[in-house]
Every structure is written in structure tokens, then in C-alpha cells.
UniProtKB/Swiss-Prot annotation:
Keyword Zinc: no
Gene Ontology BP annotations: heme biosynthetic process; protoporphyrinogen IX biosynthetic process
Modified residues (S-(dipyrrolylmethanemethyl)cysteine): C253
Record keywords: Heme biosynthesis, Porphyrin biosynthesis, Transferase
Upper classification of the organism: Eukaryota, Amoebozoa, Evosea, Eumycetozoa, Dictyostelia
InterPro entries: HemC (IPR000860), Porphobilin_deaminase_cofac_BS (IPR022419), Porphobilin_deaminase_N (IPR022417), Porphobilinogen_deaminase_C (IPR022418), Porphobilinogen_deaminase_C_sf (IPR036803)
Name of the protein in question: Porphobilinogen deaminase
PANTHER family reported for this sequence: PORPHOBILINOGEN DEAMINASE
Known function: Tetrapolymerization of the monopyrrole PBG into the hydroxymethylbilane pre-uroporphyrinogen in several discrete steps.
Other remarks in the entry: The porphobilinogen subunits are added to the dipyrromethane group.
Length: 325
């Protein structure tokens, strides 16, 4: 540690949205608590995913929609690290950058928020009428929910959380409800709006969902040293296993791939990691499932193994329609 050149100032990059700022401020506060002599500043910017709101995420492309601009700032030295929702970070990072920390994973579930004016706050997905319109910008959610609730229709809904709530409440948009990640609603203190928590048996979650990913320059030992205490081992094992799987599937962040990853016998010598995964086509009519369990320390290889099983079962054929676009 004595060989690391210390700095008295650290600059964190963040997207400008309220949720992104809450997440980044949490990281800033942890760093300052652990390193009281360091000044920590936040520099914000909009990413492509923030600016282009009239096109679905899957059609824009998948090369770091919510990360690229911040990555460029790291590479040119404008910022020292960047805070992202881990599910938005591509599995293949630009040369010169690395994932410095994965924070403790919080709620991984998705939630249904009903249009209370139309259906009442406590309406469930299964209770909605034929043809009800649900807002979601995630192909993963849409595919799994079409599989479970074929009577529903889905329409893209983009923007930050506050914008999406306004779109839901605007009758001219025709939404009967929308699907959002519980973790974001918790951070924004908006859980009172939740009508239903969608169980894993209906919809598996996104790779990395519920954790923050902190990206930094590869070889910046000082930044890595201040990030090390923020790494949550159990969450890191689960999320890195999922990212290893996604990397080999070559699916990207915006295709219908869902996971549920669990640790058993935590912190015991026989600790194991279990991954359940699903790959679907857009309407959920075709899907492939797989499950694997093994020693948790082999998280990276377990991710590769379940990816290979999915590939052997035909996942590439299902995903080819998305990867081409």
C-alpha cells in the first residue's frame, strides 16, 4: 500500500438523472467516510440513453448506451471513476477500463405499477382486462410477461422515473400500468406506488440488477484501493457469474435474458452458487432454460458453463434476431 501514490481529490462521473445522482452520492459518501482527507466531487453528464428517448433501447444499439460518455471521460482523465447501475454496464469494457467494485445487491425484483385512476392502486397484472397496455422499455420483461400474461399488450416507456410516472398518469398515452425495478423505486422512495411485486417464477431479473457497478481505469491502484471496501463479496460472486454467462451468450444488456442467482451455505466451506437462466424470443413463445450449481469460488466458470448449456440448447438461434439489429 505504501507504494501507491495517494491523491487528495477524486472526481466521480454520473448521469444527471435523480436516481443516478442518488446512487453516485451514496458512493461519494462511503468514500468520504472511509477517506476523510480526500475531497470527492461529482461531475455529471447525459449519455446517449438519456438523450434519445423516442427510440427503444434495443433499436438504438447496445454499445454502452448509458456508459460510453462517462467511459470517455475516464479515459481522457476528466473523471477518476463512474457509478452505474450494474445492469447497464456492458460485459466487454473498453481497453484501459475495468469494473473496480460491485456493491451490495439490493432488491432484484421487478414491480408492476397500476394506473390507479383506471384500475385502482392494488390492481394485479392478472386482473387487467384483455388488451390492457403496459409500459416497459425492457425486452426481457416484455418477453417473460407475454409468456405469463398473453392477454396483455406492451408499449415502450422511456425516460427517468419521474418522467415515466408522468407518462403513466397522462391518459393520452393509454398506459394501464408499467413495470419498473424495485431497487430504483426503493432508492427514490417511491415504493408506495407498487401494485404488485412480480415473483421470480413469472419474471427472472436482469444480469446485475440491484447492484451498482463502479468503473475505473485499469492500473489506477489508488482508485482501486479506495474502492476495495465497497466490494460486497457475495454480490460480486453472483453478479460476475451472471456477467460471465451474458458475455459468452453475446446477448448484451437489452435482450430477453433473465437470471436468478443464489448463494447457499454463505461463508461456509461448502458455499455453493446456483444460477437459473432463461433466454426468450420477443413474445415469449420460444424459450430455453438452464440451471447450474457448483462451488461459489468458481463463479466465473459457472457462468461460462450455463452459457454453454444454453448455447447447446439453441439460444443463439433465439438471440440472433436481436444481435443482428
Amino acid at each position: 500500500m505504501s507504494s501507491i501514490t495517494k491523491r487528495d481529490k477524486v472526481i466521480i462521473g454520473s448521469r444527471k438523472s435523480q436516481l443516478a445522482m442518488l446512487q453516485t452520492e451514496w458512493v461519494r459518501d462511503r468514500i468520504q467516510e472511509l477517506n476523510p482527507g480526500i475531497i470527492v466531487e461529482i461531475k455529471t453528464m447525459d449519455t446517449t440513453g438519456d438523450k434519445v428517448l423516442d427510440v427503444s433501447l434495443s433499436k438504438i444499439g447496445d454499445k454502452g448506451l448509458f456508459t460510453k460518455e462517462l467511459e470517455d471521460m475516464m479515459l481522457n482523465g476528466t473523471i477518476d471513476l463512474a457509478v452505474h447501475s450494474l445492469k447497464d454496464i456492458p460485459t466487454k469494457l473498453p481497453d484501459g477500463l475495468k469494473l473496480g467494485a460491485i456493491t451490495k445487491r439490493y432488491n432484484t425484483s421487478d414491480a408492476f405499477i397500476a394506473n390507479a385512476k383506471k384500475h385502482g392502486k392494488n390492481c394485479k397484472l392478472s386482473e387487467l382486462p384483455q388488451g390492457a397496455m403496459i409500459g416497459s422499455s425492457s425486452l426481457r420483461r416484455v418477453a417473460q410477461l407475454k409468456k405469463a400474461y398473453p392477454h396483455l399488450q406492451f408499449k415502450d416507456i422511456r425516460g427517468n422515473l419521474n418522467t415515466r410516472f408522468k407518462k403513466l398518469e397522462d391518459d393520452s398515452n393509454g398506459y394501464d400500468g408499467m413495470i419498473l425495478a424495485v431497487a430504483g423505486l426503493e432508492r427514490m422512495e417511491l415504493t408506495d406506488h407498487i401494485s404488485e411485486i412480480i415473483p421470480d417464477s413469472i419474471s427472472l431479473y436482469a444480469v446485475g440488477q440491484g447492484s451498482l457497478g463502479i468503473e475505473c481505469k485499469d492500473g489506477d491502484d489508488f482508485i482501486q484501493s479506495i474502492l476495495n471496501p465497497l466490494i460486497h463479496r457475495e454480490s460480486m460472486y453472483c453478479c460476475e457469474a451472471e456477467r460471465s454467462m451474458l458475455r459468452d451468450l453475446e446477448g448484451g444488456c437489452h435482450v430477453p435474458i433473465g437470471v436468478v442467482t443464489k448463494l447457499h451455505n454463505q461463508s461456509q466451506p461448502d458455499e455453493t452458487l446456483e444460477i437459473n437462466a432463461i433466454v426468450l424470443n420477443l413474445d415469449g413463445s420460444k424459450y430455453i432454460e438452464s440451471k447450474i450449481i457448483g462451488p461459489s469460488i468458481q463463479y466465473y466458470q459457472l457462468g461460462k458453463s450455463i452459457a454453454q448449456d444454453l448455447i447447446n440448447k439453441g439460444s443463439k438461434d433465439i438471440l440472433s434476431e436481436f444481435i443482428k439489429k
